[in-house]
């Protein structure tokens, strides 16, 4: 199939994760949504072994991005880019659920931006 369309609620899940990459059958980059209830977090980690850059986009809620041990409150609409070596976690200390879109790709993927971008 040359394209695939899926609503977030129809994506395959694993715990708090919406597995967008798997649902859309992507091979060039990773893209998933983590939905964190109040008081939850994702495990602290880095992406050094896979040499992956990550972009976080806060879709809803007000989680805290903890980057190298430093707290960065992030309201809905916030973007963050992380080099592979940075330790990271997402903590939802607020009263409302938080949803964060995470996009990742190896730095060696060969991506070349268009001139206008």
What spans do the regions from the language model cover?
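A short, N-terminal "cap"/entry segment at the start of jelly-roll beta-barrel domains
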Residues: 1-30, 37-38, 111-117
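Histidine-centered metal-chelating micro-motifs
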Residues: 41-43, 80, 85-90
